[in-house]
A protein has these predicted regions:
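Extreme N-terminal leader/targeting segments of oxidoreductases
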Residues: 1-22, 40, 178
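Flavin (primarily FAD) binding-site architecture
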Residues: 230-244
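Conserved redox-cofactor binding core of oxidoreductases
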Residues: 105-218, 239-240
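N-terminal Rossmann-like FAD-binding beta1-loop-alpha1 element of flavoenzymes
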Residues: 20-47
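Core beta-strand elements of the Rossmann-like FAD/NAD(P) dinucleotide-binding domain
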Residues: 16-20, 216-227
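Short, well-ordered coil/turn residues at beta-beta hairpins
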Residues: 26, 214, 224-225, 230-232
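Glycine-rich active-site loop/strand segments that organize a redox cofactor
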Residues: 66-106
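Glycine-rich FAD pyrophosphate-binding loop
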Residues: 40-61
């Protein structure tokens, strides 16, 4: 979304240039995942990305994905884990702001999410990198990315490494996004690059029904019959956050 974003009433929209079921704003990890799931559910999907290519902040990240509960990589590396142990650790690590229902869903579905990533082409090497670094300099696929093995957490839940890293030395976010964007581009979803979201469009009841987009100065109005999903969460365009 641009800094000048506003909410425009649908009654002021003279015509819809594009109509779709779901409009996804932002093609980072969240946007690509949303687009893939929406297409899989049978929706027509348009994806908007203000950059000339997708990836966003996700592509420049370390790409470490927190997965557990007994993934194939954990098992092949000799570590036992379960959704319950993962749940107990996350409940302790998240402190007073934890949401038990969300954490339970995250832990219970974690192995399925691993298989989802692999199914979309993301590779993981079943080798444990023992030296904590946050991001291994090797292409090893499993690290301790949190405090699972530290007191007091190792007294609350059985420790297990859960940092899953796509198979490439160094920052793996680029490989993660390369695979997810390639998966999106194999679907009927329509990525629109160099396009920014200028405003959301809402009806008289306040329901968001579309968005106003701008590509190289040309405005287009997109109607989203089933919803607009905002996944433009990257901070790289926020100068204050970059300076911090």
């Amino acid at each position: 979304m641009s800094e000048a974003s506003i909410l425009r009433p649908s009654r002021n929209i003279q015509r819809w240039d594009v109509e779709t079921d779901v409009l996804v704003v932002g093609l980072g990890c969240a946007g690509a995942s949303t687009a893939l799931e929406a297409v899989d559910a049978g929706a027509d999907v348009v994806v908007v990305e203000r950059g000339s290519a997708g990836g966003g902040t996700s592509a420049s990240s370390g790409g470490v994905i927190y997965l557990g509960g007994g993934t194939p990589v954990q098992k092949e590396c000799g570590f036992e884990d379960s959704p319950e142990e993962m749940f107990k650790y996350l409940m302790a690590a998240c402190g007073s702001h934890r949401d038990p229902a969300k954490i339970r869903a995250y832990a219970d579905d974690s192995v399925a999410q691993y298989h989802w990533l692999v199914g979309h082409g993301v590779p993981f090497k079943a080798v444990f990198y023992p030296d904590y670094s946050g991001e291994p300099p090797t292409d090893d696929g499993l690290v301790y990315s949190g405090n699972e093995n530290c007191y007091p957490f190792n007294q609350i839940a059985k420790p297990a490494p859960r940092g899953h890293v796509p198979q490439i030395p160094g920052k793996a976010g680029g490989l993660l996004m390369e695979k997810l964007i390639a998966a999106v581009e194999k679907t009927p979803a329509k990525p629109m690059y160099d396009t920014r979201c200028e405003a959301l469009v809402a009806d008289d009841d306040g329901q968001v029904v579309g968005a106003v987009l701008k590509t190289f100065g040309e405005e287009r109005c997109v109607r989203a019959r089933r919803g607009v999903v905002l996944t433009a969460g990257g901070f790289i365009m926020n100068r204050d956050m970059v300076r911090a």
